[in-house]
Amino acid sequence: MAATTTILSSAAPTPLTAPPRARARAPAARRRRLRARDILGAALGLANGGASAALAAPLSYEETLRLSTDSGGGGGGGGGGEFALPDLGLGGVLDFVAQNPLAAAAGVAAVALPLVLAQVLGGASKPYGVVSAAAAYRALVEEPGAQLVDIRPPGDARQSGAPDLREAKKKAAAVPYDGEDKNGFLKKLSLRFKDPENTTLVILDKFDGNSELVAELVTANGYKAAFAVKDGAEGRRGWLSSSLPWTAPKKGFSLSDLIGDGTDGLPVTLGLAAATGLGILAYTEIETVLQFLGSAAIVQLVASKLIYAEDRKRTLKQIDDFFNKKVAPKELVDEIKEIGQALLPSTGTKSQPAITEAAPATAEAAPAAATATAAPPAAPVEETSTEAAPAEPTPLSPYTNYPDLKPPSSPSPLAPAEATKNESESESAATESAPAVNSAPVAEAAPEAAPPAAPRPLSPYPNYPDLKPPSSPSPSAP
């Protein structure tokens, strides 16, 4: 050990070995190239991580001795020279690169290539990844921008339940993932989360099925970050196995299952159910609905017609005209008819009491006239029966009222003496028959009423047998 110490501390040869043969001093440029080569080899060995053991091997005793001798300040008698690092200047590096360009390029590539590969193959942090269930729950509680997305099918979520995020004052967004409809999935997410650049999503699946794939998909479409829960909801190290808060499934009917989590997509079934319920309610309570509608119409009419002065005057005038011109006349006519029917007897009941009252008066005045007028009470029955029959058409010609269609001849004028005699006879007859005036017309009205005449045909042919008129006589020969 003492000999070794003397060798390291002094450049003089040991007495056990022969002194080295004197060599010519190498040029300074050659020494610098050697030093640059040694340093470059050491750098390449460090960069490659020990791939080239020969370049990174330690210096031997002779090489160390030679370097210490070269770095000494004089010839062989120089004493007290210490080992110093090689002085590599900028000029020496430039000279080496100029003389050995291939070696310099290889050295630079060997140093830069590992750094480039580290950046490309995963040196930078990715915005998506896989985390444990406990870490995911902690992120949901601590980070305001973290949201839980449940991508399980709706049937699995209803059967097993969902995570309970009441501690974080949040709610899991149930958005089922379908690998064949990625655009629809992203659209549903955009409806739920309006600020994707500041939103971190925690993806929960039943197991590790599609959670990591969805995390990569959402980060590629503008979300800040996304992390898949390890083993999902029901895995060995998933959410349930980690004893994290969990909401048990609901056994009864729930409107939230029909409506869903999104407020923008109301299912069609809920709309149909609401329409059906409203229809049944309106059908069963139709009277109440009509009353309500009528009340609403009256309120609207009063509000629109009576608020302003001009509308109020016009409305009151219309109401007055309605009651005076449309409603009142009809009611007045109906009331007059009812009063007339109550006070005035009918036609059939009016004739019979008049006959019964007139019969005693005629019996007291003239017994002979009473016997003559005993039969007339049956006459009104005949009149009522004839009135009930349909009316015959009245002929237009007066000749039908005469037998054989022959009117009577005009009377010849009488002498003045005969005229005065006839007038006196008529006056005496009128005075004699005065007491029976009240009863005689009623008795004589029935026999004088002639039956209605048959309608007169417009053609003369019905007057001939077999509708054949007689032939015209042929003229005789002269």
Curated annotation (Swiss-Prot):
It comes from the Eukaryota. Residues 11-21, 353-391, 427-448 have a biased composition (Low complexity). GO terms for cellular component: chloroplast thylakoid membrane protein complex. Residues 1-29, 344-478 are annotated as: Disordered. Keywords: Chloroplast, Membrane, Plastid, Thylakoid, Transit peptide, Transmembrane, Transmembrane helix. Its main location: plastid. It is a multi-pass membrane protein. The chain crosses the membrane at residues 102-122, 266-286, 289-309. Residues 1-21, 22-58 form a transit peptide. Residues 142-248 form the Rhodanese domain. Residues 405-414, 449-478 have a biased composition (Pro residues). Component of high molecular weight thylakoid LFNRs-containing protein complexes containing LIR1, LFNR1, LFNR2, TIC62 and TROL proteins. Rhodanese domain-containing protein required for anchoring ferredoxin--NADP reductase to the thylakoid membranes and sustaining efficient linear electron flow (LEF). This is Protein THYLAKOID RHODANESE-LIKE, chloroplastic. The lineage of its organism: Eukaryota, Viridiplantae, Streptophyta, Embryophyta, Tracheophyta.
